[in-house]
C-alpha cells in the first residue's frame, strides 16, 4: 500500500526558530536601512538611548508601509513589482528586528502597530490602530521604535557606520551624518 506526503510547515516553530538564522545580532540594522532605501527614502535616521531601556528609534522619509501585516508575514515583502524584479527581496528582513528587541512599535502612513516580541512569536493578534498625530517628525513617513535591544551604543554605531560605508542614501546616528565614502554618489564626485 502506498501513501503520499507533502511539504508542510509548523508555523509557530518556524517563526521561533528563525531567530537562529540571524546569526549576527546586528543584522537587523542593515535590514532596516535596506527597507528605507527600497521605500525610496532619502535618509534613514537612528537614535539610540541606552538609559530608557536600550531603545533604538529608526526613521525614514520613504513611501511608508502600505500594509503593516507585511512586516509580520514571512516571505511576503510587500514591495512593488519593480523592487521585486530588481532585488528579489525575501520578505524576512523585519523579522530580524523582531528578534533584536523585546518590544516594537511601528508608525507608518498614519497607522500604528505595537507589540511584545513574545506576542508575535506566539502568533497572537496584534491591533493596528491610528497613529497619534504627534508620534513622528513631519519629515518622516515611517518610525520604528525598538525597546530592549541587547546591544550597547558602541555596538550599534559600529554596525551602522560599517553598513553606511557604501550605502545609497544618507544615514544618521544620534543627529550626526555617518560617512559614506564608498557610496555611488560620493565616488562619482571624487
Predicted regions and their residues:
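Flexible ATP-lid and adjacent glycine-rich G1/G2 motifs of the Bergerat
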Residues: 63-126
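A conserved short beta-strand within the histidine kinase catalytic ATPase domain
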Residues: 42-49
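Bergerat-fold GHKL ATPase/HATPase_c domain
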Residues: 1-41, 68-73
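Acidic ATP/Mg2+-coordinating residue in the GHKL
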Residues: 60
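Short beta-strand-loop-beta element adjacent to the nucleotide/active-site pocket used for signaling
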Residues: 49-56
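N-terminal assembly/transducer modules of large multi-domain enzymes
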Residues: 2-7, 37, 124-190
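Structural motif
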Residues: 43, 55, 103-105, 112, ...
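Charged, alpha-helix-enriched surfaces in structured cytosolic catalytic cores
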Residues: 23-28, 66, 92, 151-155
